[in-house]
Each structure stands twice: as structure tokens, then as C-alpha cells.
Amino acid sequence: GRGCRAGRPRSPGRGMTGCWCLPMQAELDGAAYAIRTDYRDILELLRWLGGTADPQLDQSGRWYVAMRLFYPTFAEMPQACWPQATDFLAQFLAAGRREQARPGPPLMDWQQDAPLIAAGISRAAGQDVRTLPYLHWWSFLAWFDAIGEGSFATVVAIRDKLRRGKRLENWELDFYRTHRAAVELRGPASPAQEAEKQRLLALLQ
């Protein structure tokens, strides 16, 4: 079968062209593939990758769903291109940055923390980004990185201290007691919990 080479971007928007351009398509083996770039689409994709959309899917299954969500014409993509397409998706999610993963459990969850993140990003952007008809994922991340002091920063700082066994300040302890449900990250539902959820939903229909 025909191999797949990651095409070298030759013009803005044709691939991963660095942080000064916003990639709008992927070039794989000389062919251009459309990609979904709006931050809402990417957050949905991350919900599947993180296992919250379907806890019963294994890692390979999650990535397969993510690829189908990211590439609208994934069904037409030669299977030989899948590894390069996966690499492109991973780089896109990281906004082209090469960052070392932090050890230990995650400190945030895009779904659980959505209200806090939306408030912080809207403050950084000077507008409610949820009302925008379109916002590129990289632009969304740039505003996310610009979130300063606020509830989201406080929640993440407390989670980090709890993870490392550090003592909380008195005001942090008060915040934790008052907003415990917001501070404590909820993991994906277990198969048993998901089955019970589906059973209850069936009773309501």
C-alpha cells in the first residue's frame, strides 16, 4: 500500500506553521485534509479523549473517535496516513508547543471547570467568547493562558497543594470547604455507574 508522508507546510494555513499562524488544514502525503478548528469542537474531542464521553472505550478507541471528529473526511483518508494524522492532531491540541507533561494527576478538567474557565477567558478577552460564532482553538488557548487571578486560578492552586500534600492557607481552607465540589475533580464514570445512568434514563423515556 502507499505510504504516507507528512507534507512540509509551504504557505500559511497549510499545516503546522508555527505559533504566528493558525492552521486551518492538515497536509498529509501531499493531500490537504480539512480539520475542525473551533474551540467547541476541540473541547468535545477532548471529552472523548479523556474518557468522560464513553468510559468503556480503551485508549485506541478514544483516539479513533477523536480522529473522526477532527478530520471531517477521515473515512476517505488512507490508513497509512493515520499515524501522521494522529501526530498532527496531538500537535494541534498542544498549539504546536512542545511541553513536558506534569507528573501526577491532572489539575483541571475542561468539562467540570467549564464555568470557571469561561469566566476567566471572557475576562482576559474582554468579551464572552461563548457568544462568538467561531474561535480558533489556538486563539482560545492564548486567552486561556492569559487568565490571571480569579476563581479558576484559586481552584487549580488548591488542587496542586492537595496533590503535593502542602498545607493550605486559612483562606484557601475556607474556600475549599465552601467550594469542595468545584475543587475536587470527578473522574470518568465507572462502567457500573454508566449502566445505572442508562437504566435510569430508560425509565424516564
Where do the model's predicted regions map?
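Charged interaction scaffolds used for protein-protein
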Residues: 5-34, 39-43, 50, 59-205
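N-terminal regions encompassing targeting/leader/pre-sequences
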Residues: 1-2
